[in-house]
Amino acid sequence: PSGKVTDDLSHQQVRELAVRYHIEILTINAVYPFNRRSEEVRQLTESLLKEAQAIGAKSLVLCPLNDGSEVPASETLGALRDLAPLFAFYGIHGLVEPLGFPQSSLRSAHQAQTLIHDARVPFKLLIDTFHHHLYPQAADEFSQVEVADIGLVHLSGVDDSRPREQLTDAERIMLTPKDRLGTCEQVKALEARGYPGVDAFEPFAPELAQWSEADIEREIEQSIALIQRHCA
């Protein structure tokens, strides 16, 4: 709710909580818009890398410009090359997340993968089941995405009935039997192709801020159970 990575906790408090509860902090969000090559973006990147390092996070997410402006592939490739040395300096992994929104400058996971390879940087893909659903060509391109290049998968659900091009982050909830994203099917398809990595829930709906601890526990357990039943 605070808009800060650690809310009102110090870096040391976060580290101590992680040790106490045996939690590994895999990633924090996010460099935006990573494919705008500016001093402001570079400073934001360095600030978030310091934050990730301070709390012991392993990775930092990079999200593309999402305002309807076109960004040439060459510009995105250059941005990857510009930022990679910073990630290396701080010892943090980069996760590039294509955004499926119609106004996104990088919607395709396959294109993102190609740009990462062409830039010769050690970043990996972050696949999000919501954004996979929003991008019309995602299913057709799925077979071209190398599973070994995927570093993390974000999961959420949408029950809202409006067309996919009208969906926003505000409709993203935990998983239910009425999920329109096909998140369980996406997880099963990734596992069938050998994805050995981590899945993480990323709902955004405003009502989540009102949930109690019991609500959070129930929703996580129900979502995990849905995935396990589907992938059994």
Language-model features, listed with the residues they occupy:
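Glycine-rich, proline-tolerant flexible connector loops at the mouths of alpha/beta enzymes
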Residues: 1-15, 67
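Active-site acidic/histidine proton-transfer and metal-coordination neighborhood
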Residues: 17-20, 24, 34-124, 184, ...
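Conserved, mostly hydrophobic/aromatic
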Residues: 18, 52, 94, 128, ...
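Conserved beta-strand positions in the central sheet of alpha/beta enzyme cores
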Residues: 27, 61, 95, 151-154, ...
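Acidic/histidine-rich catalytic cores of soluble enzymes
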Residues: 84-180
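A short, acidic, amphipathic alpha-helical segment used as a generic capping/interface helix at domain edges
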Residues: 178-192
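C-terminal helical cap(s) of enzyme catalytic domains, especially alpha/beta-barrels
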Residues: 211-232
